[in-house]
């Protein structure tokens, strides 16, 4: 019986772990990848999606296409039981729990932005980690530009056209342009 490798997360780490393990171990293992979406997001292109220089479809690729020899599940991870080597996921329309057994587990779920540490961020900040984030930022900027276009008051126009980028990482720098 083949060794079962279960990978949680289909971002850069999960994607490249799956690809590398398949290349290295070939048919000696059965690899399954669980991800919230059934596509891979090339995050370095999200600022271009937000800016409108490329469409959203150019920043994503179906995981099943990229990882042809690996089973892909679009699902939410609920829990991990290391004692029984079982991961519980919710998938499909009815979101019934499914239990997946593994011999080896790769946890590559990525990170989330915690905006709760600074007053006002949860209400006013936008993040840049997902395709929806890029779309939301684009819509917000367009809304602010349209607001500035119709107002006659210089202070309102200035406020509508003032944006603050927090973070000097790749996404922050690229979002600034």
Spans of features found by a protein language model:
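Beta1-alpha1 glycine-rich phosphate/pyrophosphate-binding loop at the start
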Residues: 1-79, 163-164, 170-177
């Amino acid at each position: 019986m083949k060794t079962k490798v279960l990978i949680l997360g289909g971002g850069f780490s999960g994607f490249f772990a799956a690809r590398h393990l398949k290349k290295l171990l070939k048919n000696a293992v059965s690899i399954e990848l669980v991800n919230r979406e059934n596509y891979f997001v090339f995050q370095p292109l999200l600022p271009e999606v937000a800016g409108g220089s490329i469409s959203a479809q150019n920043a994503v690729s179906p995981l099943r296409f990229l990882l042809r020899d690996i089973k892909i599940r679009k699902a939410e991870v609920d829990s991990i039981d290391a004692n029984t080597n079982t991961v519980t996921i919710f998938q499909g329309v009815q979101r019934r729990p499914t239990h997946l057994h593994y011999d080896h587990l790769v946890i590559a779920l990525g990170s989330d932005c915690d905006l709760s540490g600074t007053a006002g961020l949860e209400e006013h900040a936008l993040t840049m980690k997902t395709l929806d984030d890029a779309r939301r930022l684009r819509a917000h900027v367009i809304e602010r530009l349209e607001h500035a276009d119709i107002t006659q008051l210089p202070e309102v126009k200035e406020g509508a056209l003032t944006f603050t980028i927090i973070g000097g990482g790749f996404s922050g720098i690229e979002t600034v342009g």
